Amino acid sequence: MKLAVLGLLCVPQIVCAGLGRYATLVHADPAQPSRRSDVSSIRVTYLGVNGYQFEADGHALLVDPYFTRACLSDVALQQPIRPNPAVVARALDHVRPHVDTILVTHGHFDHLLDVPLVMQKTGARLYASNTAVKLATAAGAPPSRCKTARPGASFGTGPWQVNVLPAAHDRLFGRAPYSAAAPLRKPERPRDWRLGEPLAFLIEANGRTVYIDSGGRPELLPNTGGKRVDLAILGVALPDSRTRFAAIVRSLRPRFTLPSHQDNFFAPFVRGFAFGPLTDFRFVIRTQQEQQLPGKLILLDYFHPWTIP
């Protein structure tokens, strides 16, 4: 695995690294959005990687907030990685000072590394898998504010109603990364941030419903109980999740589809959005168009809020 990941250092970025060529798909609120968006819908802010802030009625909920962006060489060579407080502080300028809850889809570092620090800064509670909760508390998150979430569970937090769904992680070189069973310890190196049980979430507030996962496999599609989905945020980082893209969009039938986890999460977010070396957004667009999938395909740029109409 180490040599395979190190090989990614030699993979060129796609020719158009940013969102410029897809400007017609990029959505954002006006510079001075109406106050009504606070009370009549859900406002979505993309935080990078698979991270999002959702706002409703003056409350905020985060999913997978990760800002530190450990460098690829440190990950490939399994060097110690730690949250970067200065980088996290800069990113949190775009997040509400108080956050009700953080949801985490799985225990990998690019989803969980910064969560204990974000909890400290925002007062948030954490809901995540048993593995992710153990990793977070070992990394300094207060146990009293960490709750284990399991598929089938449902809970309310602020204006939010959250349903927890089963999910799967894409395979990389034939297996899900960092999925081996091993004793959990204080995480220091990338491989210490174990996958655990992947989760997806159905988030409801103000008559809007958002589905979010971090990727998946064709054999596992979500069961939303027939609920209408306004926005589907679908991880498309690797081939497994792109292979299931058409099937999951047909299953969810969302009004809007937002492909996620397709930026280069080894590059600092201050450089702006750049597609990752293993992503293939052109495939996603082609699939949407050729198969005439339901809903509208959209993109969000870092820290530019958009309110679901």
Q: Predicted regions: what is each one?
A:
Residues 10-86, 169, 189:
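Zn-dependent metallo-beta-lactamase
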Residues 50, 70, 107-113, 133-136, ...:
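Active-site environment of divalent metal-dependent phosphoester hydrolases
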Residues 151-199, 206-208, 289, 293-309:
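Flexible, acidic/histidine-containing loops and adjacent segments that form or flank the divalent-metal
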Residues 184-251:
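Active-site-proximal loop/helix segments of hydrolase catalytic cores
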Residues 37-42, 56-61, 154-163, 204-210:
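Beta-strand-turn-beta hairpins that frame and shape the catalytic cleft
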Residues 34, 59-104, 108, 113-117, ...:
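Pre-active-site segment of Zn-dependent metallo-hydrolases
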Residues 63-64, 98-107, 127-129, 211-215, ...:
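Active-site neighborhood of phospho(di)ester-bond hydrolases with catalytic His/Asp-centered motifs
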Residues 137-154, 250, 255-309:
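Binuclear metal-ion centers of metallo-dependent hydrolases, dominated by the metallo-beta-lactamase
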